[in-house]
């Protein structure tokens, strides 16, 4: 009887969460700029009905009836951005930064410094209180949220896999992908070598959020999933902080190949993974207190030097 009672309680709790989700108010989205596949003919950008490897922002001007296109390059700018989960309590202050197309920008700092919050603003999980965030010169408030997020590839520390085959989990990044595209993405992510050793290879069934795989293997699948989506901008949120050093190298190699040619924002506790970044932003209490390359920040002998060397006496 007690077991049945516990099952009933668990069912009621689950039902309560489902009904709470159904009662949620849909997100307000005032965006009107959309993301489309495009081709370039001379100096003219045109919309394409099929995947071309080139993306463009489609801007329809209601006042003139004219539609223009702007190539998606991956230029991201934060201009004096303030943000607080509660408007009365600002947690990010005067954030200024720019990422040029193809650059790797790393955020480092203590827990709670604001690293993940910044990346959550890029994909508009939250809206800012002050300032502007521009994507290829377009205020992100003008971009439809679904299209904005479609342009971003996200690899998180906690990888979520669903019940299905390995191939289906990778293909989730691009539902119409061919088998050959899945194989290519897995090879780029360094996942092919372990997948082919599984009992049924790419047809191996995964259950329980991939419980039969190691943390490193799950992350390799997440990289493959991002690779097949072919996003122009990447967000890697502490993606190697939960695996052993040996596996980390394989994951990092896969990430390096994925990052090639893409604007990338990286958050990591292991500073060795961000040494080759074009710019490292050091955050403390919601402010950028240092910025520069690995070598430049070590020369400063400030907060980054302290984090990197473990020297608590660094000023």
Predicted regions and their residues:
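Cytosolic ends of transmembrane helices, especially the final helix of ABC transmembrane type-1 domains
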Residues: 1-23, 30
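Flexible, glycine-biased helix-capping/connector loops in cytosolic signal-transduction modules
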Residues: 24-27, 200
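Solvent-exposed, non-transmembrane helices and loops of integral membrane proteins
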Residues: 28-39
